[in-house]
């Protein structure tokens, strides 16, 4: 009888110990989390209020994007949120990319002065966007790529300020495919709505490979630059390709914003490969969503969308449940990553890479 009791006790402790290595849905709210890629562009604070409820800190990234608020308006929103929620809201600055005088000392001085003003409010990074490489051209009509020598003074200035660059350079590889061949519906719907960015329709533009080569060359030119590649570094389609860059560039990390569905798609094909990747590169991955408060007129709708997105992602990383996605057909299993890996992805890496003063 005593032997049976001892065996039962040991077995129970073993199961409990195994379970304690992983988070569950019950741990979602108590665990501190950071969404390292959001866009706070409204003054109603619905997004921030939901973040507090879900125990999230936020990094809002300003973007030189003609379809959104101006760089100045975004900066004002970011600083207001940062001041209202000290130690909980952080921002990445940017600058307006004006091609007038491009390639001259005057251009770089003007860009640096603008950027210096924008980071003075306490920016934790500088965001560079896909207009570099996909929109901006010099006076001869040639596309300006991120490794252009004329950008070197700006890059050097950012390094001198000990700030990382958060770079959305290029697009997902799906961008260069027909809509019918894209792997996830979030891409096909986006590029259907934004044909100006659907490179399959614009073969005269730089190729996908051109974008990746230019980004890689930037990192080769500036080995001391801390670089966080947005959207899995535009290598979302293959964790093996991303691993090659993380091996080559020790000062490179990536956020997952708007690309977790690509990890899930790969999980549906080879879960072990994706899980092994996340564990091996656990110090280089930052959780992010690319969520915004553009629909801030409806508090309930916005709050529900944010909460459900965050919770669904948490389940994918922490559980081994069978799941489906509305972005592709088929089933996949959650990665059930160990607690220490989840903590790094969800908070510790963002704190370290962005040097956050969390309160």
Predicted regions and their residues:
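Hydrophobic faces of well-ordered beta-strands that scaffold small-molecule active sites
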Residues: 34-38, 58-61, 89-94, 126-128, ...
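Active-site gating/metal-coordination segments in enzymes
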Residues: 18-20, 24-26, 75-198, 203, ...
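H/E-rich (His + Asp/Glu) clusters that bind or coordinate divalent metals
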Residues: 203, 207-217, 222, 226-359
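Generic structural signal for hydrophobic
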Residues: 50-51, 118, 158, 218, ...
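An N-terminally biased module of ancient metal coordination in phosphate/nucleic-acid-related enzymes
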Residues: 19-88, 109
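Basic/polar N-terminal segments that are highly enriched at the extreme N-terminus
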Residues: 1, 16-27, 358-359
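Bacterial N-terminal signal peptides
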Residues: 5-16
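Acidic-and-aromatic substrate-binding clefts and catalytic sites of carbohydrate-active enzymes
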Residues: 37-45, 64-74, 98-109, 136, ...
